[in-house]
Amino acid sequence: MTSSKMEQRSLLCFLYLLLLFNFTLRVAGNAEGDALTQLKNSLSSGDPANNVLQSWDATLVTPCTWFHVTCNPENKVTRVDLGNAKLSGKLVPELGQLLNLQYLELYSNNITGEIPEELGDLVELVSLDLYANSISGPIPSSLGKLGKLRFLRLNNNSLSGEIPMTLTSVQLQVLDISNNRLSGDIPVNGSFSLFTPISFANNSLTDLPEPPPTSTSPTPPPPSGGQMTAAIAGGVAAGAALLFAVPAIAFAWWLRRKPQDHFFDVPAEEDPEVHLGQLKRFTLRELLVATDNFSNKNVLGRGGFGKVYKGRLADGNLVAVKRLKEERTKGGELQFQTEVEMISMAVHRNLLRLRGFCMTPTERLLVYPYMANGSVASCLRERPEGNPALDWPKRKHIALGSARGLAYLHDHCDQKIIHRDVKAANILLDEEFEAVVGDFGLAKLMNYNDSHVTTAVRGTIGHIAPEYLSTGKSSEKTDVFGYGVMLLELITGQKAFDLARLANDDDIMLLDWVKEVLKEKKLESLVDAELEGKYVETEVEQLIQMALLCTQSSAMERPKMSEVVRMLEGDGLAERWEEWQKEEMPIHDFNYQAYPHAGTDWLIPYSNSLIENDYPSGPR
């Protein structure tokens, strides 16, 4: 009996020590979790049914399993993404304990209170995005200690006081503090010298200093008699010269109006380098050298907006140079610069970052980073022999990434950007096959003399929404339609419009062909043969459901891109599809009961591996 009691006591002691060890481990390893728990306790959700903080369980050893939190391989928090999450409350000073944090994204919520000084302790921070909240108080001077900070958006809040001079020592690439209550002088030194008034608009700040006026010569005295005679003679000579010059001027004007494939250097292009915010203004000579005089061997693609050339800058970096073709109008240069800067302010992991531009009296050129893996279209249909096909996991990730990029354009840009030509050819892939939406903003840029929503229809056959084609009026739902067709390209590997399908008596429009195949319940015949059967049938079914929801004939019935993102993340696709089935069954005979797999969590597996690759809104 005594032996039995001894064993029981030993077991109890062991369990006690084990619990004590676990508690000690949790306390030691969960300092970051405690900081995030403080943030959770300070915030509340305006949508309790979809509370994004619901998974933030303080009893877990690490916060790395929480949704919207990303960790590095050492289980240190590197990203907190709570943008557009319907949260209210205040930020907490404990955030300063996240010493490995690189991205803090809290845009488009209803956060109040002040920005904690302790954020200045986040020495690894690259991006701080607090856009569109109700934050008040000053901009903390401690942010000047953030040597790695490159992206700072504090616009559309109620911040007051002066801009701290300490920020001028930070090498910012993107800055937006517009639409606040700031006062005082705008710093002009450091990185602030690169930013234009658009970054500071709608405050009570002192205007940027104007350049010194050009010196003027004193008024000359009235001419004497001899001078008058010389002036008359000079006038006669000038008139004669003008008589001969007029035909030459007319000929030059005619040449300029003709579309040319040649580039001419003019003195205006040798002006001192001009920066628009983080954009560089390249000289035409730089881009001629980079692209080998725009050699045809460097052409990456051709589209409705012009040709794209591969180039290598003097510093060795590869770029893609887009030569725009458009009709210039009076005053267009200033408007072009304004629109270019607005495009450059759209910064997101899934958007192609504009690096710079070149503007001359005859040319408009945009410079982008070079995307190593080309476009989705080229990977699907034009891949070099020996290169592997896009596997199914990559295609799923492309669907989600491109949706996030489009949602950002629609919901999080200060001026909503409608793409108007969403297709596989405009979804680019970086070195890691992350989807990057390209060519956004160009439709507006090329119509900068048009102040109305209705413009010439731009787009690609097979991707154009019916209401856009019939009325010329585009909206964000136009992009949703194009996105839905792009999903079908990902699934089938086929073009949106292909006359070759006539050989099999099939519809030339991909969307119509898919609907016909689905009526015959031949799902397997839809899937790209390049996948060689290596896909999950339930996942294909769900992506088709999403595509059909996005391509409904009625624009009002299509989901918003933000809703598409949520459904791809596993929230509401089954319900939305079932509702659509009840309404559209007579028209679209894709029987949901024939494909009974209802789960949607395939698109966001709840594992650290995918969370670590999730970069919702940082600069590229």
Swiss-Prot record:
Renumbered ranges of LRR repeats: 100-122, 124-146, 148-170, 171-193, 194-215
In-chain residues carrying the UniProt-annotated modification Phosphoserine: S295, S375, S378, S470, S475
EC number of the protein: 2.7.10.1, 2.7.11.1
Active-site residues, as the UniProt record annotates them: D421
Recorded topology in the membrane: Single-pass type I membrane protein
Residues recorded with modification Phosphothreonine: T291, T454, T455, T460, T471, T551
Sequence intervals crossing the membrane: 235-255
Subcellular location(s) per record: Cell membrane
Record carries keyword Cytoplasm: no
Keywords: ATP-binding, Cell membrane, Glycoprotein, Kinase, Leucine-rich repeat, Membrane, Nucleotide-binding, Phosphoprotein, Receptor, Repeat, Serine/threonine-protein kinase, Signal, Transferase, Transmembrane, Transmembrane helix, Tyrosine-protein kinase
One Pfam assignment: LRR_1
Signal peptide: 1-33
SMART domains assigned to the protein according to its UniProt record, in alphabetical order: S_TKc
Region Disordered: start-end pairs: 205-227
Domain of life per record: Eukaryota
Cytoplasmic compartment residues: 256-620
Gene Ontology molecular function terms on file: ATP binding; protein serine kinase activity; receptor serine/threonine kinase binding; signaling receptor binding; transmembrane receptor protein serine/threonine kinase activity; transmembrane receptor protein tyrosine kinase activity
Biased composition (Pro residues): 209-224
Stretches of the chain found on the membrane's Extracellular side: 34-234
Record-level GO BP terms: brassinosteroid mediated signaling pathway; cell death; cellular response to hypoxia; leaf senescence; protein phosphorylation; seedling development
Keyword tRNA processing in record: no
GO cellular component annotations of the record: mitochondrion; plasma membrane
Subunit structure: Interacts with the EF-Tu receptor EFR and FLS2 in a specific ligand-induced manner. Interacts with TMK4/BARK1. Interacts with ERECTA in a EPF2-induced manner. Interacts with ERL1 in a EPF1-induced manner. Interacts with TMM. Forms a complex with MIK2 in response to SCOOP12 perception.
Biological role: Dual specificity kinase acting on both serine/threonine- and tyrosine-containing substrates. Positively regulates the BR-dependent plant growth pathway and negatively regulates the BR-independent cell-death pathway. Required during SCOOP small peptides (e.g. SCOOP10 and SCOOP12) perception and signaling; associates with MIK2 as a coreceptor upon MIK2 perception of SCOOP peptides, and relays the signaling through the activation of receptor-like cytosolic kinases (RLCKs) BIK1 and PBL1.
Protein name: Somatic embryogenesis receptor kinase 4
Gene name tied to this protein: SERK4
